[in-house]
Amino acid sequence: MWRLKIAEGGNDPYLFSTNNFVGRQTWEYDPEAGSEEERAQVEEARRNFYNNRFEVKPCGDLLWRFQVLRENNFKQTIGGVKIEDEEEITYEKTTTTLRRGTHHLATLQTSDGHWPAQIAGPLFFMPPLVFCVYITGHLDSVFPPEHRKEILRYIYCHQNEDGGWGLHIEGHSTMFCTALNYICMRILGEGPDGGEDNACVRARNWIRQHGGVTHIPSWGKTWLSILGVFDWLGSNPMPPEFWILPSFLPMHPAKMWCYCRLVYMPMSYLYGKRFVGPITPLILQLREELHTEPYEKINWTKTRHLCAKEDIYYPHPLIQDLIWDSLYIFTEPLLTRWPFNKLVRKRALEVTMKHIHYEDENSRYLTIGCVEKVLCMLACWVEDPNGDAFKKHIARVPDYLWISEDGMTMQSFGSQEWDAGFAVQALLATNLIEEIKPALAKGHDFIKKSQVTENPSGDFKSMHRHISKGSWTFSDQDHGWQVSDCTAEGLKCCLLLSLLPPEIVGEKMEPERLFDSVNLLLSLQSKKGGLAAWEPAGAQEWLELLNPTEFFADIVVEHEYVECTGSAIQALVLFKKLYPGHRKKEIENFIFNAVRFLEDTQTEDGSWYGNWGVCFTYGSWFALGGLAAAGKTYTNCAAIRKGVKFLLTTQREDGGWGESYLSSPKKIYVPLEGNRSNVVHTAWALMGLIHAGQSERDPTPLHRAAKLLINSQLEQGDWPQQEITGVFMKNCMLHYPMYRDIYPLWALAEYRRRVPLP
């Protein structure tokens, strides 16, 4: 059986940590573990998921839950309640629901104080990792038979009915993910006619019916060129000389969004080297299977701008294609020939590799995320197959792997700090302090130990990095990358917990460390008043015209985000109340400008676009929370009135809310089909209305929402897993299984606290 290990580094000499691996979560397979009953429980969960995979596509993250509930001997001893038609909700029944949810949520916590969970959903995360270890000769050591079995299970579970795979688990089939997952199956041992439910044949038919892999998007062209299934001549240029451009140019790396910068950094190294892995018999077979004409006859120059229509979310503007054509026709032939290959290209590759090593070392070889991780790992191997850098990368691969009832996938990276911050706030909101003292103390300890206490090493500005001291990351301290909303939520948790006796929740965080967090937040506000997520926004918006991806939008430069802004307002308002003398004027100006940003970014229908959750419901919750914290009310703020109107008009007949993931790419509100409600959306909307003072005007919509949440609670005290609720870059969804535990509980806690009940 599979077991999740917490905060363990083992004795691997290539592993190192800044805080003794607090927050680390790694799965291990133990063939001797588990009773017959436990194994049967896991198999039943797997079977149920597969049989219902087209109805509910996100997993329930059950393997970890089975383990932790069993280890903690959890049994729900508090009886459930239901609210009948025409029945009035009482304080007592709400409290019973809260107690059941609180006990369950507290039991899901680990020994180091965080709440482990999957954070995945995109179907292009795992295949490149498989490609990388295949190319480098480490496939068998990184993915032994049980790993391969679970990776294949995940691929089969998320294959669409038409034979393809979507960009994410709920998406329509795309060439990018269908080709990647097909190759992944073949590398893991499936024959051309193999796979569950004829998976390989169905996938290959989909690929060939849509023009073959010459129509794969640019990221796919890169990976297939690395494998040798494609030719680098069929890719648009990614010159490493980009890394030696003078800083005054608008296209300098320092002006790029960090994720874009750190994806194209190792890509440009591999492109500059024109690296191709070993041409094995399997690679030769794949050339035959995936192209619609003989490999030797393909006109690679004509494939550069080909892309299947199913993959296109952001069509390249003409100016971009002209730039790529110019680089392809004029620049690359020069840079790859003497003397420029020695004078310029060699220097560019050295500088690029210097940046790769810097980013690796400052993230303890986790890197900023899974796409970058695999590319940087491969670049290190290309530079030195026996070097320590590659070995350190291999040691951190387990940090990215996650097992659920739908199989093994690769995480975007962990959401440990993100989930912990909201879980702690939800528990605090219940006011059931006496019943959850250990959970609060452990959560507090985890949050304190996870704060980043240093800036990136050395002259970090010359490496295009921003300050990180005082921040919280999305995952753990080792990751090292500051995020504004994670910092705001971490700061808020520490401030709220400081109001409780230390004998219950532990010693409060030192003021200097809180001041560091405030400094980080203040540094990330833009001239527009909004908050960027990772680094200050301010680069020219027209640079988005150069977005080289086909399936993401707004990835070239950093932007301001509603959620980050709303979180920061709430944290700084609370900080100002508890530390009124610290940078008072700066904080007041920050809040004033942040409120202006929220008012300016409200849409015509009264909602706010959510960048990291689905979608207008999510954004509206953060915006209304920020406005209310800043002292705005329904009476004195038109934005709040419009926001309330939006939420009330989108409430369903059953009292809930349900928003389709399609809202995010389409940028208009799209309800779930069939008038379905989603408990997470319902919780966000309920809290948004409570922030806006709805209970003082007409509490009926709040009662209807609370009724749905109370009646949706499951036997153990959690809530059902429904549609996916996370998103990034407008067009790709992320699955957060902990959301179904945290947000309904938090919303009902706020409901009980703010709405008069009999």
From Swiss-Prot:
Record SUPFAM superfamilies: Terpenoid cyclases/Protein prenyltransferases
Catalytic activity field: (S)-2,3-epoxysqualene = beta-amyrin
Organism: Pisum sativum (Garden pea)
Protein's name in the database: Beta-amyrin synthase
Annotated catalytic residues: D485 (proton donor)
GO process annotations (BP): triterpenoid biosynthetic process
Catalytic EC class: isomerase
Keywords of this entry: Isomerase, Repeat
PANTHER family xrefs: BETA-AMYRIN SYNTHASE-RELATED (PTHR11764:SF58), TERPENE CYCLASE/MUTASE FAMILY MEMBER (PTHR11764)
CDD domains per UniProt: SQCY_1
PFTB repeats, residue ranges: 148-189, 514-556, 591-631, 640-681
This protein's GO CC annotations: lipid droplet
Family as reported in the entry's similarity comment: Belongs to the terpene cyclase/mutase family.
Pfam family, one: SQHop_cyclase_N
Record gene name: OSCPSY
Summary of the function given for this chain in its UniProt record: Oxidosqualene cyclase converting oxidosqualene into beta-amyrin, generating five rings and eight asymmetric centers in a single transformation.
PROSITE patterns: TERPENE_SYNTHASES
E.C. number: 5.4.99.39
GO MF term set: beta-amyrin synthase activity
